[in-house]
């Protein structure tokens, strides 16, 4: 399991979810701006209690899913749905996957994220199945190949005729 053992720390969903929201609103966001969307981290498989806490906090939630249709996997079975019901609550899946998936969990090839373009193209025709969503972690830019792949992905997206939508609006639909 991927975790950092911290002396004296005990996992608490309220602290993790509500505490994160409060921290962002008080210290990071512009004054008066409210958090609308909570993005799951790690394996992105929240339990029902985690979904309950986002609901109590008045925010939507998103991440997870494994849309990975590419030229080497050209099948709609590699396109995830909009999300999944978890014991009466709904988790919205991210439209596309991040670099971690395309780089074999950051083991390489580090240019692998450019393959998300194949996913964008596959889910575009004959009709749009998933929106273009550039979802990456900043560590991608620690490798030259990762930075170049990100440049390619942004260049591709900017060359498309798109309708911009905030992630919070996508999750609401």
How would you label these PLM feature ranges?
Residues 73-74, 144-147:
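Short conserved micro-motifs at the rims of enzyme active sites and ligand-binding pockets
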Residues 2-29, 81-124:
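Alpha-helical scaffold elements lining the catalytic groove of polysaccharide deacetylases
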Residues 44-52, 76-84, 160-164:
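Eukaryote-specific, cytoplasm-facing alpha-helical/coiled-coil scaffolding segments in long proteins
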Residues 18, 22, 52, 148-151, ...:
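Solvent-exposed, polar/charged alpha-helical surfaces in well-ordered, non-transmembrane soluble domains
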Residues 56-62, 154-167:
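Structural alpha-beta junctions
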Residues 139-143:
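Short acidic, S/G/P-rich loop/turn micro-motifs used as interaction or catalytic elements
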Residues 171-173:
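Surface beta-strand/loop "capping" patches
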Residues 1-49, 57-78, 129-133:
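Metal-dependent polysaccharide deacetylase catalytic core of the NodB/CE4 family, i.e.
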């Amino acid at each position: 399991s991927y975790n950092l053992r911290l002396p004296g720390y005990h996992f608490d969903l309220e602290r993790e979810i509500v505490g994160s929201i409060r921290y962002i609103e008080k210290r990071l966001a512009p004054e008066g701006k409210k958090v609308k969307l909570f993005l799951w981290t790690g394996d992105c498989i929240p339990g029902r209690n985690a979904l309950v806490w986002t609901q109590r906090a008045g925010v939507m939630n998103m991440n997870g899913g494994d849309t990975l249709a590419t030229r080497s996997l050209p099948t709609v079975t590699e396109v995830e749905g909009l999300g999944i019901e978890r014991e009466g609550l709904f988790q919205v899946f991210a439209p596309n996957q991040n670099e971690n998936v395309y780089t074999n969990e950051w083991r390489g090839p580090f240019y692998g994220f450019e393959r998300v373009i194949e996913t964008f193209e596959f889910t575009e025709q004959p009709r749009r199945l998933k929106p273009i969503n550039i979802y990456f972690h900043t560590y991608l830019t620690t490798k030259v190949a990762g930075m170049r792949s990100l440049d390619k992905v942004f260049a591709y997206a900017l060359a498309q005729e798109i309708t911009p939508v905030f992630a919070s609006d996508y999750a609401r639909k």
